[in-house]
Design a protein with these regions (language model features):
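Auxiliary tRNA-acceptor-end handling modules of aminoacyl-tRNA synthetases
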Residues: 52-73, 85, 89, 94-104, ...
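Hydrophobic positions on the alpha1 helix immediately C-terminal to the Walker A/P-loop
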Residues: 308, 312
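Glycine-rich phosphate-binding loop used to anchor ATP phosphates in small-molecule kinases
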Residues: 360-418, 468-482
Length: 557
């Protein structure tokens, strides 16, 4: 019987392959054309793992580790390799839990609970075991099991967080990955084998360690580990807040929401009270130093900067100060003088788009007690205007300034350091999906932004997803390099928020058509939100940072 052949379009050329050929085999024939390892493939626009088999005529587009989704797949593989190496090195009997917590620098912070002493010698053994498995190029197999079987499997393995998670899955089956006999669950796509996982380095850090990995820009280079101690402290502090409530993972949150003694309202109010306490402490710290006249607030997109600045201003008043907001946007250069980006559009995100000298001139005069007229930028005309907005600072007056570049000293180069108080704010998700699957803070911020932009700007989820990578690049250039220069960091993420945002985000994500380039990302986010049992928004306080995104807040934003 003649073997069935299928026509495959790749890189503008057509080639025939027998039915049942894996995409991994096809990728092998084309790998030398690509500068980085091929790890995934789009089949007629649908993202697939390389282990899948050819079943019909199709067009293929390969994905490498040099792309964002390929890099995430690589990191997922390293995480799996790491967890197996820990169990191989120590044995199951000595381990209570291996946990991958959150992102630190270019890697993940991890801890091991159990009968062990984590030191450099043990870490070296774990890393050596990881390299051994990578050198052997062991297959990473995938099998689909019934959800009930997965629950029982992870109960047997002592992976309690996964057991809890799957009790709330509405799908009937779950994909399980294995290296030899070691099985685990990972949210997202996986590399075909351990041979792809060549680049990683383990560093002792705090009570655990960091597994450092390459980024998409340089997928064969392990960046040196640069501790971010302030950011790490905030993340750890936020995680302790979840631990105090017994909520570390999505499964634990779902248990809390659905349990017989559950009171979601109490959870919301406790979380909000914890944030208010932190804001009050920041205000007291500022008020305790009379030299501080400029409160400079910066953070990435959808961090809740506006609501935070309003709530901080209220607490500053409680502390006896009189806060005045100033928008850095009012110091944009006239549009004719605005630098252009690569597409020839005005680039309002770069520092050069601002009249930095005028900004410093005005703030220095205010610091000296002089009365000045502040500008207002008219976005319709593209020009600065003066509309009679005068200001003069008294002894108790203080400026609250919010803007992308507020942590960058180049923005306030003429202002004395002793007069500045810098605050970095971000939504640093403290919740994990389970022990081995972290939630990227960028996902939380993207969902926040989609919900807000759909509600306030008429921007579709498709448009928000399409522009997100550009937003991220701006953050990488203008915000993240300066975050450790902040005097204080504030985490605006709330343990419960994704369970509330779910009801707002799902309808707009379902509106993205399958033939859109943004469909794969929408599909991924929908799968992610499906892990959560929803919480109604009726108990979210009107001054909550979350109200900046879902609406019905008390601030005029």
């Amino acid at each position: 019987m003649e073997q069935q052949m299928y026509k495959v379009q790749i890189d503008g050329e057509e080639k025939s392959f027998p039915a049942g050929t894996t995409y991994l085999q096809i990728a092998g024939e084309y790998q030398e054309r690509y500068p980085h390892d091929i790890v995934l493939v789009y089949v007629n626009g649908k993202l697939q793992e390389l282990g899948k088999k050819l079943k019909k005529d199709c067009a293929l587009h390969f994905v490498t580790t040099g792309e964002t989704i390929g890099n995430l797949t690589y990191r997922r593989g390293v995480s799996f390799l790491l967890v197996k190496a820990v169990y191989d090195t120590l044995g199951h009997d000595k381990i209570e839990q291996v946990r991958i917590h959150f992102s630190v620098d270019k890697g993940y912070y991890c801890t091991i609970k159990g009968d062990l002493k984590l030191d450099q010698e043990l870490l070296a053994r774990i890393e050596e075991r990881m390299h051994e498995m990578a050198d052997k190029d062991l297959s990473i197999r995938k099998r689909s099991v019934h959800t009930d079987e997965a629950v029982e499997m992870f109960r047997k393995y002592g992976m309690k967080d996964k057991e809890r998670l799957f009790r709330y899955r509405r799908v009937s089956t779950v994909n399980i990955y294995s290296i030899n006999e070691f099985e685990d669950y990972y949210y997202g796509y996986m590399v075909p084998s351990t041979g792809y996982l060549k680049y990683f380095k383990l560093y002792l850090y705090d009570e655990g360690f960091v597994v450092q990995m390459p980024e998409a820009a340089e997928p064969e280079k392990i960046p040196p580990f640069q501790p971010q101690n302030k950011l790490f402290h905030v993340l750890k502090e936020s995680t302790r807040g979840g631990d105090m409530l017994g909520i570390e993972t999505v499964g634990a949150l779902n248990d809390y929401v659905t349990g017989g003694n559950a009171n979601p309202k109490e959870l919301l109010l406790v979380q909000e009270a914890m944030q208010e306490k932190k804001i009050a402490q920041i205000a007291e710290q500022i008020a305790g130093n009379p030299q501080k006249k400029f409160v400079l607030i910066a953070g990435p997109s959808s961090s809740g900067k506006t609501t935070f600045s309003r709530r901080l201003s209220i607490q500053l008043r409680v502390s006896g100060l009189v806060p005045h907001p100033i928008s850095v946007d009012d110091y944009f250069k006239n549009r004719v003088d605005t630098p252009l980006d690569a597409e020839g559009k005005p680039n309002y995100e770069c520092l050069e788009a601002l009249d930095v000298e005028l900004f410093n001139h005005d703030l220095k005069k205010l610091l000296a007690g002089e009365r000045i007229e502040l500008p207002t930028f008219n976005f319709k005309t593209g020009k600065r205007e003066y509309n009679g907005h005068y200001m003069q600072l008294g002894e108790q007056d203080i400026l609250v300034i919010e803007g992308i570049h507020c942590l960058n000293d180049a923005l306030t180069h003429d202002l004395p350091k002793e007069n500045k108080f810098k605050i970095y704010i971000s939504a640093l998700t403290q919740l994990n999906i389970d022990e081995h699957n972290r939630i990227a803070s960028t996902d939380g911020r993207l969902i926040r932004r989609m919900v807000r932009d759909s509600r306030t700007r008429g921007t579709s989820a498709k448009q928000t997803i399409a522009m997100w990578q550009s937003v991220r690049r701006g953050e990488e250039n203008n915000i993240f390099p300066y975050q450790e220069d902040a005097d204080v960091m504030f985490n605006s993420a709330l343990l419960y928020e994704l369970a509330v945002l779910k009801a707002y985000a799902e309808p707009i994500l379902f509106g993205i058509e399958k033939d859109c380039a943004e469909y794969q990302e929408a599909k991924r986010l929908l799968k992610f939100l499906d892990y959560f049992v929803g919480i109604g928004s009726e108990y979210v306080p009107q001054n909550s940072i979350l109200r900046e995104f879902i609406g019905d807040g008390c601030f005029d934003l």
